Regions:
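Short, electropositive alpha-helical surface patch
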Residues: 176-184, 219-223, 272-289, 344-360
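Conserved C-terminal portion of the radical SAM core fold
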Residues: 217-228, 244-304, 313-335
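Short acidic active-site motifs
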Residues: 206-210, 274
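Short acidic, glycine/proline-rich loop/turn micro-motifs
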Residues: 233-237, 300-305
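Flexible, acidic/Gly-rich N-terminal and inter-domain linker regions that tether
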Residues: 1-112
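Core AdoMet radical
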Residues: 130-207, 218-246, 260-264, 289-291
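C-terminal accessory extensions appended to soluble enzyme cores
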Residues: 1-21, 26, 280, 294, ...
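Canonical Radical SAM [4Fe-4S] cluster-binding loop centered on the CxxxCxxC motif
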Residues: 105-144
Length: 360
C-alpha cells in the first residue's frame, strides 16, 4: 500500500515553506519507488524560480507516492510542477576523494569548489554510516591519498574548502597528524582556502591548540559529529560521551579559535520532544550541520523515530522552523541532505540549463 500526505494541508500549516521544499521533504521522507537491475540509484536535480535541490534515494521504496518510471518522476501518478532533470544512475562506487563542483554536476553555495577526502575508509565507528567498504578499500596515508588527488590536477589554488572525513583513528594525536599532513600537502600546492573537519576525535584543549598551530593560519571549520541527541549509544558505540560533556567540549573548541564551529545532526532519528529540549543547548556555540537521515536497510530503519516515520514531511517542516527560530535565519550549506534547499541566486546558473558538462 502506498503511503501519502496532503500537499495543500502542509502548505496551509507551513505558509513560509514553499511547494518545492514540501516535495523535497516528501522525497527525503518517503523515498522513491524505482526499478534498478544492478543496485544503481537515480539522481535528480529539481528546481523552480527560487530554489534547487538534488536527491538520490538510498534504496527503492514501493510504498512511496513518488515513482520513477519510463524516465519520468511522478507524485501520485502526476509529474511534479517543477523543472526535473534526471542526471544519471549512481553506482555507489567507493572513492578516496571526490569534488563538489560544476565538473561533477554537484552544486555548491557561491560556486565554491570543495574537495572531500576520506583516506581512513576502514572505520566502523558509526552505525549510521551508509558505506560498508571493509572489503573494497583499505586505509592509506595522507601522502598516498594526496598523490592520488594530484594525478588529475596541477595545484590547489582554486579549492575553497578541503573537507576531511577521517573515520576513527587510534587516538587524538593520530587524528591531528592526519589533518595536519593533508592540509600541509595541499598548502604546498597552492591551497589557500579553509579546512573542514568532520569528526569527534579532536576534543581536548591541548589537542585543538596543537592542530590550530599545525594549520599555521589555515581557518578551521569543525563539525562535531553528534548526529542525534538521544540515540548516540546506538549510532556511536565506540565514542559515546554524555550530551552535557559534548556541549562543554564544543564550547571549548569554539573558544579555542575554531573559525566555524558546528555539530553534525541527522533529522529523522530523534523525536520532536527531545529535539526541542536539546537543540537550544548548542544555540550560542555552534550551528547544525544537517544531513537528513536515510536508512539503507531494515536494521537502520529501526533508528527512525515514530514522529518521523508516521509523518515525515510535517516532522521535517517542524525541525526547520525550530532551527530558524533558534538561529534567526535559514542555515544554507553544501550538504545535499540539508533542511534548506539551494537558493537559485547563490548557485551557478549553469545548473538551471539541465545540461551536465561532458554528458555527466
Amino acid at each position: 500500500m502506498k503511503r501519502n500526505f496532503n500537499i495543500s494541508g502542509m502548505l496551509e500549516e507551513f505558509p513560509n515553506i514553499s511547494l518545492l521544499d514540501i516535495h523535497y521533504y516528501g522525497l527525503k521522507g518517503y523515498g522513491i519507488d524505482f526499478d534498478s537491475e544492478h543496485g544503481e540509484r537515480p539522481k535528480f536535480h529539481i528546481w523552480d524560480l527560487n530554489s534547487l535541490f538534488s536527491v538520490v534515494p538510498m534504496q527503492p521504496d514501493i510504498t512511496s507516492p513518488y515513482t520513477f518510471k519510463s524516465d519520468t518522476l511522478t507524485f501520485n501518478g502526476e509529474e511534479l510542477p517543477f523543472n526535473v532533470q534526471f542526471v544519471k544512475w549512481i553506482k555507489g562506487v567507493p572513492s578516496y576523494f571526490y569534488y563538489r563542483n560544476i565538473d561533477e554536476w554537484i552544486q555548491t553555495i557561491d560556486n565554491e569548489i570543495v574537495l572531500t577526502t576520506n583516506f581512513q575508509q576502514r572505520c566502523k565507528g558509526c552505525s549510521f554510516c551508509c558505506r560498508d567498504l571493509q572489503d573494497k578499500l583499505s586505509n592509506i596515508t595522507p601522502k598516498k591519498g594526496m598523490d592520488l588527488v594530484m594525478k588529475d590536477r596541477q595545484d590547489f589554488y582554486n579549492i575553497g574548502e578541503l573537507a576531511v572525513v577521517t573515520g576513527m583513528f587510534r587516538d587524538e594525536d593520530t587524528t591531528i597528524n592526519h589533518l595536519s599532513e593533508v592540509t600541509n600537502i595541499a598548502r604546498n600546492k597552492g591551497f589557500n582556502g579553509h579546512l573542514f573537519y568532520i569528526g569527534t576525535q579532536v576534543r581536548t584543549e591541548k589537542g585543538i591548540q596543537r592542530l590550530l598551530d599545525n594549520l599555521n593560519g589555515v581557518p578551521l571549520r569543525y563539525s562535531y559529529a553528534l548526529e542525534t541527541f538521544i540515540k548516540r549509544e546506538e549510532l556511536h558505540p565506540l565514542k559515546v560521551l554524555p550530551l552535557d560533556e559534548i556541549v562543554d567540549t564544543v564550547r571549548m573548541l569554539k573558544q579555542s579559535g575554531v573559525w566555524k564551529m558546528e555539530y553534525g545532526y541527522m533529522p529523522g532519528i530523534d523525536n520532536l520532544e527531545s529535539f526541542y529540549q536539546n537543540a537550544c543547548k548548542f544555540k550560542d556555540i555552534a550551528r547544525p550541520h544537517v544531513s537528513i537521515f536515510r536508512p539503507i536497510n531494515a536494521e537502520q530503519s529501526k533508528l527512525v523515530s515514530d514522529d518521523c516515520q508516521s509523518d515525515p514531511v510535517r516532522y521535517l517542516c517542524k525541525m526547520r522552523e525550530h532551527f530558524e527560530k533558534l538561529y534567526g535565519c535559514p542555515i544554507y550549506g553544501n550538504n545535499l541532505g540539508n533542511l534548506w534547499t539551494f537558493p537559485i541566486n547563490r548557485i551557478n546558473p549553469i545548473f538551471m540549463t539541465g545540461e551536465p558538462p561532458n554528458g555527466r
